């Protein structure tokens, strides 16, 4: 009996919202379908479906977005990405070095040496991203790093940005250098990471900490929170000495029982300027938004529009892949295993309507009865007809299908006349040119021209935009989508305020996401939070992203890292030494052992060295890094020669082959039975 989840359903803002899953005979996900219905009439308001397929090695190498041709990932080895096809047409090619790191990325109708878009990447000896050079010089970037693994400089043809950090690794300042320009922006925070008044602009400020991590005011707004710590009101701040005219605007935020933003309004002079309502599925993903804007009616009065602007959203797992309005549909294909957008496909709704057709099964069911009411075929018959239709359209009808038709007294020619002709809608395809984090900087057309470009600060605020073709580009930092009506960025589980560089509600996973439950990563240059839950570290250090590229790489590396920390916690409960002691040494050993088994000793060594470089901090013992690297070396050897990493690292501890600041003596050796209950989980 199958115990796989097939359907989830709930009511959101008066709508029945459901998610349906399909699986193959091996239990792998083959499809996800999202629906929104009017609960009173049963009318289907929104439908979105994504299909998945796998190759013989079990890698997810094919995805079929809703109403688009299949996307095929071309891979080699254990899943390293070599290219991408859309509906059989090659769009992207990747060249990699001997460590499987991406060195060249080409896009366009002639992908390869004559590609319209060609991005070349180089790396430092430590595996950090060193440069990204494009065949259009305006987007060239060179990266500079310090000895601690911090990104301290990004240089381009137009400007250079230099980054300063605190002793705890927080972004402390940004200096922008360009011809006739030298600007330094400081970022002051309290110990918990909350923004404080700029000491250069407000030298008289005595504020040193925000109680409960709730910012009450800044240079632009006054804020109010409810008993749950959720932002409920934001009002324009009137500077001291300015005469009040009661024209300040107030933003109001309302939430459901799951602390999700469901209603937003902006009011001025007691009248609403804009209102919006948000709809979520059972997994908390936003499925739709409705926006009413203030406009002049037929009588000349200004009031909210009667008919809202409706936007529908479609998802593939936790990644937003479809944005549909009343006029167009925008679909995004991401880099495998990441939140970095790769390809943008836009289709006008009129073109989509022309492409709508009945399947062969639907045609036969609708025309299969004399009374005109149609018939319902069994599911197995529908599958047979769907397969037959694919074969007819490809002009490759199998002998099996011909034999089946003969048994039914039918011919291929008879069924072919029932197949409705296909219409291929006109689509605009663009490539996302992103920064090292995955924030889009430009949209490149297939002929290599820039159709859109944007400039952002380190926290995702848009500083400048060139948009001659009026393209809608809502994506910001990985996992974020800009809402024009509120100025907020929807970030999967929460909403992010880019002006404050933090979330407007506490972290739904509590302290697992950090001590400050409003905090976005305090080093947004190298750390991202695509889920609105917790940070993903070492995004540019070479520790993960640039060492373990490929379809399974990032996911596998993150999973191994999490397992290593859990292994360390369990060993600490037995022998202690979670910091610079026995448990810490076993954690390093286990981490490198698992990385070696998964990626090989060369890449494991790169990951280990850059993990230590990124973790260096002011005031740490001088021997700490040497100790960790020695334990890493032991772990790499275990990965090459041992069957099970947990057992191997416990044995290294028991025999005194691991390293601590003050030495490690196995005065309390871990017995086989004592460690097996914990170690068996790894």
From Swiss-Prot:
<dbReference type="InterPro" id="IPR001826">
    <property type="entry name" value="RHS"/>
</dbReference>
<comment type="similarity">
    <text>Belongs to the RHS family.</text>
</comment>
<dbReference type="Pfam" id="PF22322">
    <property type="entry name" value="DUF6973"/>
</dbReference>
<protein>
    <recommendedName>
        <fullName>Putative protein RhsE</fullName>
    </recommendedName>
</protein>
<feature type="compositionally biased region" description="Basic and acidic residues">
    <location>
        <begin position="348"/>
        <end position="360"/>
    </location>
</feature>
<dbReference type="Pfam" id="PF03527">
    <property type="entry name" value="RHS"/>
</dbReference>
<feature type="region of interest" description="Disordered">
    <location>
        <begin position="348"/>
        <end position="372"/>
    </location>
</feature>
<comment type="function">
    <text>Rhs elements have a nonessential function. They may play an important role in the natural ecology of the cell.</text>
</comment>
<dbReference type="InterPro" id="IPR022385">
    <property type="entry name" value="Rhs_assc_core"/>
</dbReference>
<dbReference type="InterPro" id="IPR050708">
    <property type="entry name" value="T6SS_VgrG/RHS"/>
</dbReference>
<dbReference type="InterPro" id="IPR054246">
    <property type="entry name" value="DUF6973"/>
</dbReference>
């Amino acid at each position: 009996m199958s115990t796989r989840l097939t359907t989830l359903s709930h009511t959101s803002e008066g709508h029945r919202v459901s998610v349906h899953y399909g699986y193959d005979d091996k239990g792998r996900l083959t499809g996800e379908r999202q629906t929104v219905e009017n609960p009173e009439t049963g009318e289907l308001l929104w439908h979105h479906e994504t299909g998945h397929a796998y190759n013989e090695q079990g890698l997810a190498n094919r995805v079929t977005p809703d109403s688009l041709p299949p996307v095929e990932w071309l891979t080699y080895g254990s899943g390293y990405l070599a290219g991408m096809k859309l509906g059989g047409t090659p769009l992207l090619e990747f060249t990699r070095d001997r460590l499987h790191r991406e060195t060249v990325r080409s896009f366009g109708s002639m992908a390869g040496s004559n590609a319209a878009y060609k991005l070349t990447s180089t790396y430092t000896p430590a595996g950090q991203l060193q440069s990204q050079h494009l065949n259009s010089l305006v987007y060239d970037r060179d990266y500079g790093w310090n000895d601690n693994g911090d990104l301290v400089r990004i240089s381009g043809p137009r400007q250079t940005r230099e980054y300063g950090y605190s002793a705890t690794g927080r972004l402390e300042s940004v200096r922008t250098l360009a011809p006739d320009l030298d600007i330094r922006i400081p970022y002051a925070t309290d110990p918990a990471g909350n923004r404080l008044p700029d000491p250069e602009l407000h030298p008289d400020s005595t504020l040193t900490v925000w109680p409960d991590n709730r910012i009450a005011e800044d240079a632009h707004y006054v804020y109010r929170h409810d008993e749950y710590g959720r932002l409920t009101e934001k009002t324009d701040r009137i500077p001291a000495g300015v005469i009040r005219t009661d024209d300040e605007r107030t933003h109001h935020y309302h939430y459901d029982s799951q602390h999700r933003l469901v209603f937003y309004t902006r009011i001025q002079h007691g009248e609403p300027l804009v209102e919006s309502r948000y709809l979520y599925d059972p997994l908390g993903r936003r499925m739709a938004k409705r926006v009413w804007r203030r406009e002049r009616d037929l009588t000349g009065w200004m009031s909210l529009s009667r008919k809202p602007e409706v936007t529908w959203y479609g998802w593939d797992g936790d990644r937003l892949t479809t944005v549909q309005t009343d006029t167009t549909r925008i679909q995004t294909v991401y880099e495998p295993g990441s939140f970095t957008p790769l390809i943008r496909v836009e289709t006008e709704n009129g073109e989509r309507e022309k492409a709508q057709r009945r399947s062969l099964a639907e045609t036969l069911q609708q025309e299969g009865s004399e009374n005109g009411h149609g018939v319902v075929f069994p599911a197995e018959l529908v599958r047979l007809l769907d397969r037959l239709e694919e074969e007819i359209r490809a002009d490759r009808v199998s002998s099996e299908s011909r034999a089946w038709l003969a048994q039914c007294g039918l011919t291929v020619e008879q069924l072919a006349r029932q197949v409705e002709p296909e219409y291929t809608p006109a689509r605009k395809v663009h490539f996302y040119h992103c920064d090292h984090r995955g924030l889009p900087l430009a949209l490149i057309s297939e002929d290599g021209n820039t159709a859109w470009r944007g400039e952002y600060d380190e926290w995702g605020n848009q500083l400048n935009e060139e948009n001659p073709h009026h393209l809608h580009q809502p994506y910001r930092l990985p996992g974020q989508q800009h809402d024009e009506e509120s100025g907020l960025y929807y970030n999967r589980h929460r909403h992010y305020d880019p002006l404050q560089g933090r979330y407007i509600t506490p972290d739904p996973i509590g302290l697992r996401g950090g001590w400050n439950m409003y905090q976005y990563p305090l080093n947004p240059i190298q750390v991202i939070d695509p889920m609105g839950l917790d940070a993903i570290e070492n995004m540019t250090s070479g520790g993960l992203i640039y060492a373990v590229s490929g379809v399974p790489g990032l996911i596998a590396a993150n999973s191994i890292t999490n397992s290593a920390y859990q292994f360390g916690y369990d060993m600490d409960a037995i022998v202690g030494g979670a910091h610079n002691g026995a448990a810490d040494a076993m954690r390093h050993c286990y981490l490198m052992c698992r990385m070696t088994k998964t990626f090989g000793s060369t890449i494991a060594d790169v990951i280990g060295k850059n993990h230590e470089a990124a973790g260096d901090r002011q005031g740490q013992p001088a021997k700490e890094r040497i100790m960790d690297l020695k334990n890493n070396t032991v772990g790499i050897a275990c990965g090459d020669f041992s069957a099970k990493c947990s057992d191997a690292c416990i044995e290294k501890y028991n025999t005194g082959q691991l390293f601590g600041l003050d030495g490690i003596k196995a005065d309390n050796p871990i017995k086989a039975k004592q460690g097996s209950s914990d170690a068996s989980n790894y």
